Design a protein with these regions (language model features):
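Catalytic nucleophile-loop/oxyanion-hole region of alpha/beta-hydrolase
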Residues: 1-22
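Short secondary-structure capping/turn micro-motifs that flank functional sites
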Residues: 1-3, 37-38, 60, 148
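Aromatic/hydrophobic pocket-lining residues that form π-stacking "cages" and hydrophobic walls in ligand
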Residues: 14, 40, 128
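Mobile, glycine- and charge-enriched loop segments
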Residues: 18-30, 110-111
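Short helix-capping segments at alpha-helix termini
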Residues: 23, 47-48
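Gly/Ala-rich beta-loop-alpha elbow adjacent to hydrolase catalytic centers
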Residues: 31-40
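Aromatic pocket-lining residues of Rossmann-like dinucleotide-binding sites
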Residues: 43-44
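The alpha/beta-hydrolase serine catalytic core
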Residues: 48-130, 134-165
Length: 166
């Protein structure tokens, strides 16, 4: 488990965790989902990772933040002036976060397998497909899958997917 709430915190925390947990192993596989995958890509891009399995990864945080701004009817000027704006859907929009992801784009070269739910409400298919193509990742789409894999059917699909990828 990790405690980071932002990519700049993950950039400090994740390499220490990685070195402590994985430093003696010859090969390491990372399995992460959603924002954990984004944090891993942001913080561990230079680490010795053999492969990665990402479930519903956030692959374009700037786009996600801009989408959330639209959902909350918040302009970039509003966010810049107010610095942080709580939303009705439980997220707090942050100017610092938006600036950070713009200034620190993800560069990920680890061989990666991605599982994506067809009904993911945070990342569009176009976004995930473009990312997978750009980094040479395999992309598996679960029909009727959601962002959060949690039902028995989704968890069985996830388990079968990992077995097929190995």
């Amino acid at each position: 488990d990790y405690s980071s709430q932002s990519p700049w915190e993950a950039k400090k925390e994740f390499p220490r965790l990685f070195d402590n947990l994985c430093g003696t192993y010859e090969t390491v596989t990372v399995i992460a989902n959603s924002i954990g995958a984004f944090f891993a890509m942001s913080a561990l891009a230079d680490s010795k990772i053999e492969k990665a399995y990402f479930i519903s990864p956030v692959v374009d945080m700037e786009r996600l933040i801009r989408n959330m701004m639209q959902w909350a009817n918040v302009t970039e000027d509003d966010l810049q002036k107010q610095k942080e704006i709580p939303t009705s859907f439980g997220e707090t929009l942050s100017w610092a976060y938006l600036c950070y992801v713009r200034e620190h784009p993800v560069t990920w070269t680890v061989p990666t397998h991605i599982l994506y739910g067809e009904k993911d409400n945070l990342t569009s298919y176009e976004t995930i497909a473009e990312f997978a193509d750009r980094i040479g990742a395999t992309l598996t789409v679960m029909e009727n899958g959601e962002h959060w894999f949690h039902t028995k059917e989704q968890m069985d699909f996830l388990s079968d997917w990992i077995k097929q990828c190995t």
